[in-house]
Amino acid sequence: MAKEWGYADHNGPDHWHELFPNAKGENQSPIELNTKEISHDPSLKPWTASYDPGSAKTILNNGKTCRVVFDDTYDRSMLRGGPLAAPYRLRQFHLHWGSSDDHGSEHSVDGVKYAAELHLVHWNSKYNSYATALKHADGIAVVGVFLKIGREKGEFQLLLDALDKIKTKGKEAPFNNFNPSCLFPACRDYWTYHGSFTTPPCEECIVWLLLKEPITVSSDQIAKLRTLYSSAENEPPVPLVRNWRPPQPIKGRIVKASFK
């Protein structure tokens, strides 16, 4: 069987390029954001998300993260504006976290790592399918939200309560009537740059919108993510305690801010 990628020493991010050459590409994500080097771009517009809660379908443990999947067969849950020239359809969201609360996010801001990072993945509906969108530099838009430790967040708990149904790799459960807008911070300011998926095959097709303001969740809530397993039900248990990729070289890319 082909070696499967993961986050352990033997198959982790340092090895991904052996199977997925993109991982050593020129436009890889995540990156370290150094705010002193980021300039305000006054042409960047506000972004809007109009999500249909009825488009949420299932929640899945794929052995790498927990993912909530949406119906993207038509323009139903949409992201518009910001740096985007077209509307993008929400396909899924997932999370990255660490083994303790002092790290776990993939992007960092002036050296600060957050406890977790939420990624909402959308595809440009001018392309006739998600698979086609992956082949274009403007094919995918990901909204990244940082999670910091503080007060419990009730909306986040709705997601966490479903994790008991998907403890092990390969498990999937219904997850309906959820509007992910409830996980956005009040402030919509963002940084944007061109990058890649942070998991193999690491395709370089992503317009990133990283929200400046984190949302707050409790330490107990983040701990619940670590109760998932990267192993299947019939395998020796392997806890899914960390699933973040370290920062990648920026290689001359420009990061812009929507705010002063």
From Swiss-Prot:
One of its GO terms (molecular function) is zinc ion binding. S-thiolated both by thiol-disulfide exchange with glutathione disulfide and by oxyradical-initiated S-thiolation with reduced glutathione. S-glutathionylated in hepatocytes under oxidative stress. Zn(2+) binds at H94, H96, H119. One of its GO terms (cellular component) is cytoplasm. The modification Phosphotyrosine is found at Y127. Residues 64-67 are annotated as: Involved in proton transfer. It is found in: Cytoplasm. Keywords: Acetylation, Cytoplasm, Glutathionylation, Lyase, Metal-binding, Phosphoprotein, Zinc. Reversible hydration of carbon dioxide. Belongs to the alpha-carbonic anhydrase family. This is Carbonic anhydrase 3. It comes from Bos taurus (Bovine). The lineage of its organism: Eukaryota, Metazoa, Chordata, Craniata, Vertebrata.
